[in-house]
């Protein structure tokens, strides 16, 4: 039916293309894996991802659109702190940070780890420059109805003077975490403004 080995030539050509395609795919996969390994081994803590920018702006009460996050987020200053016995020390990265402080347009937001209903999460708290009021707060990594109550509250002596139900462990944890952030941000604020 086919003269002069047409089928044999067609099959040989097909096999050559198949080998080239497989080799090309393997090398591109290796390149992607190398890039992912390089990126994961050296995190860039000077840049904040858009999701975190959203949490920070929400806590600060900054109204913005999703498409503006990246450009506005470039103006956020980020500071990482370790803490021992109430004394805060700056550290170079997010790793081992007990408190992360964001500073934007003369407003502060603090981020700290929190455990809510057995889930590890992070709480963000926005604080006015005079440390007299909490602007807003929000969670990343857990959900809680309590979060809506921790906004627009007065601060006195570096803490919220409110009472929570002693039997509600999440409410106690919220209050402790918010007060920890307020106290920490107020203590380290002179370092940020210099």
From Swiss-Prot:
Disulfide bond residue pairs: none
Chief location of this protein within or outside the cell: membrane
Lipid moiety-binding residues (S-diacylglycerol cysteine): 22
Compartment(s) where it occurs, according to its Swiss-Prot or TrEMBL record: Cell outer membrane
Lipid tethering residues (N-palmitoyl cysteine): 22
Keywords in alphabetical order: Cell outer membrane, Lipoprotein, Membrane, Palmitate, Signal
Highest taxon above the source species: Bacteria
Signal peptide: 1-21
Topological relation to the membrane, as annotated: Lipid-anchor
Protein name: Outer surface 22 kDa lipoprotein
UniProt GO cellular component terms: cell outer membrane; membrane
